From Swiss-Prot:
One of its GO terms (cellular component) is extracellular region. Belongs to the three-finger toxin family. Short-chain subfamily. Type I alpha-neurotoxin sub-subfamily. Binds to muscle nicotinic acetylcholine receptor (nAChR) and inhibit acetylcholine from binding to the receptor, thereby impairing neuromuscular transmission. InterPro entries: Snake_toxin-like_sf. Residues 1-15 have a biased composition (Polar residues). Keywords: Acetylcholine receptor inhibiting toxin, Disulfide bond, Ion channel impairing toxin, Neurotoxin, Postsynaptic neurotoxin, Secreted, Toxin. This is Alpha-elapitoxin-Bf1b. Its main location: secreted. The keyword Glycoprotein does not apply. One of its GO terms (molecular function) is toxin activity. Residues 1-25 are annotated as: Disordered.
Length: 25
């Protein structure tokens, strides 16, 4: 999965989608 963290300008690939303001797809 790709998680876009609003606190980071670079997307990170993770198996677990964190809760919060992150956008995962």
């Amino acid at each position: 999965r790709i998680c876009l963290n609003q606190q980071s300008s670079e997307p990170q690939t993770t198996e677990i989608c964190p809760d919060g303001e992150d956008t995962c797809y």
